[in-house]
Amino acid sequence: LTVMVGGKLDPNFGTPLELTAEVVAIGGGRFDVNMLGFESFDLGQAVLLAVGAIRILVTEKRGIGGNHPSVYEHFDIDLADAKMVVLKTASNWQFYQQWISEVIRVDTPGGTTSHLEELPWQHLPRPIYPLDEMAEE
């Protein structure tokens, strides 16, 4: 299967990536999980793709759902056997604490960058912290 993934939210932050992959499993739907004040999350339709030894979860709906271990369990992936798990999140890695030997934070370009000054602000009242120097009161 050749498919375009990602890059659909805002073309300013990246374009879709063409992948040639094998469909490993189809699933998704609603998950009952107590997470960050939510009692459940809905992935919508989801597919697990394989590109060589790499597994990629692609979901219909955006959100935090793909950042919970129950999603891997849903697709019969044992996290204890994984050499590496990459999450598209800056904070939800805590759910993986029992499997973590190392956390490597990566600040990728796009709408979730930690470098707020690099975002294309257009209608932002100035000055505003942390983008501008603020006068001491």
Task: Show which residues each predicted segment covers.
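Extended hydrophobic packing segments that form well-structured cores
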Residues: R30-E137
